[in-house]
């Protein structure tokens, strides 16, 4: 009887691990700035309350990584996401700009990340 219980527990553990891997997707974030060349780097300002990369199904928040060379990759749970942030962008000519990404800032505008590999292009607006 005890062996049966151990076997059931191990089977459940292995099944749970396999399912959790299927729930993850690899997301590639690309950035554009109002028709300008892609920035060398974009660093989100996480001190602002409106900065988010939030799964609206689970309400889990992810840290927006530094986007270097106009692109970055991150692994998140599959779901529907709101993405919004203000950031400091450094352009190829060395100048810096304060930018905002708000195209996916509400549940109505949220982006669907349910495939295994998803690409999201963030259109940044220059603030100053």
Q: Where is each model-derived feature located?
A:
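Tryptophan-paired
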Residues: 49-80
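Hydrophobic beta-strand residues in large extracellular and virion-surface proteins
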Residues: 27-33, 53, 74, 81-83, ...
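A short, solvent-exposed beta-strand micro-motif common in secreted/extracellular proteins
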Residues: 72-97
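Short coil-to-beta strand junction motifs in C2/discoidin
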Residues: 41-48
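Bacterial N-terminal signal peptides that target proteins for export
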Residues: 1-5
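Bacterial Sec-dependent N-terminal signal peptides
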Residues: 6, 14-36
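Structured interaction patches on ligand/partner-binding surfaces of diverse proteins
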Residues: 88-128
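Beta-strand elements of well-folded, non-transmembrane domains
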Residues: 33-37, 52-55, 89-91, 126-128
